[in-house]
């Protein structure tokens, strides 16, 4: 008699994806982030669902409903801070996952990679709208500033902004629709994750050497399930330490002041995970130019498969490319720091230099260095 796991129409799909899946024998801890992101998504949907039970998407009561969740709902403070800090964990893992993909050349799986870029955009949109919901000062002004960027689009811009706002400023209509989108998007993200995995399982996983591993596969379970559980354990320890000891470490104090359209905060800035893109946006004095640079700073990821000029897939055996990779990481950290600083000297100049270096490294330095390495290896 056939094993149910292998014959049942539904369980069979799970089996081929998580149990009997042939996986390379040498994938390192850098391959743990996929499962960690899945756990993060599940956690966000679950905590978000419980928050939505008590939250009211109305300008007059939104702020007090969040206060009510923290003060009066059983473990409401825990749910709220797990959701807020869970988003930070989500982005840490996202960036590490993308960094791994760049370092080991996983972007050569073009379909998987492009769906991944779309996933990143969807998660960024969801996080932005979620930040607006508590209706604090930074929520309101962040929403005003970021949505206003669309007015830079020629001809249709101003109309588009008013259409998104549902009026002539960020108000009740904006908050209500942002809540609706913030609720539905994670489920769309879940569907996209399934497509992401579908494309990945068409080719199989990459590995640190960047060489085809068909001749050396091991079953996903128990080897990588136990490895994933260890990763999840580390993640939960980190997340719960953050939630229990310093829940507001990554937040902005301004968001504990209720939204006031008549009073602008001295420094409007998004959550830390958007600061690098915000720094790129601010480094260009022209509005449309800034918006284009902002969009391209994310969409540039789609160019990696085209820009790959090395005869080797992975950077494991390419020391010069490794140096550039870490230069890019340092550059992004500088951009993140600059994004949180006021618009004044010397931060403006540092931001502009870091923005130019970001695009220059990806578009010119990395492909040309890869070609040089080919020459050095006489390929």
From Swiss-Prot:
Q: How does it sit in the membrane?
A: Multi-pass membrane protein
KW S-adenosyl-L-methionine (keyword) present? no
UniProt remark on cofactor binding: Binds 2 heme b groups non-covalently.
Task: Kindly name one Pfam family recorded for this protein.
Answer: Cytochrome_B
Q: Name one GO molecular function term.
A: ubiquinol-cytochrome-c reductase activity
Binding-site residues for heme b b562, renumbered to this chain? 83, 182
Q: Which UniProt keywords apply?
A: Electron transport, Heme, Iron, Membrane, Metal-binding, Mitochondrion, Mitochondrion inner membrane, Respiratory chain, Transmembrane, Transmembrane helix, Transport, Ubiquinone
One GO CC term of this entry? mitochondrial inner membrane
Miscellaneous information on this protein? Heme 1 (or BL or b562) is low-potential and absorbs at about 562 nm, and heme 2 (or BH or b566) is high-potential and absorbs at about 566 nm.
The UniProt function text for this chain reads: Component of the ubiquinol-cytochrome c reductase complex (complex III or cytochrome b-c1 complex) that is part of the mitochondrial respiratory chain. The b-c1 complex mediates electron transfer from ubiquinol to cytochrome c. Contributes to the generation of a proton gradient across the mitochondrial membrane that is then used for ATP synthesis.
Q: How does it assemble?
A: The cytochrome bc1 complex contains 11 subunits: 3 respiratory subunits (MT-CYB, CYC1 and UQCRFS1), 2 core proteins (UQCRC1 and UQCRC2) and 6 low-molecular weight proteins (UQCRH/QCR6, UQCRB/QCR7, UQCRQ/QCR8, UQCR10/QCR9, UQCR11/QCR10 and a cleavage product of UQCRFS1). This cytochrome bc1 complex then forms a dimer.
Indicate what this protein is called per its UniProt record: Cytochrome b
Which gene does this sequence derive from? Answer: MT-CYB
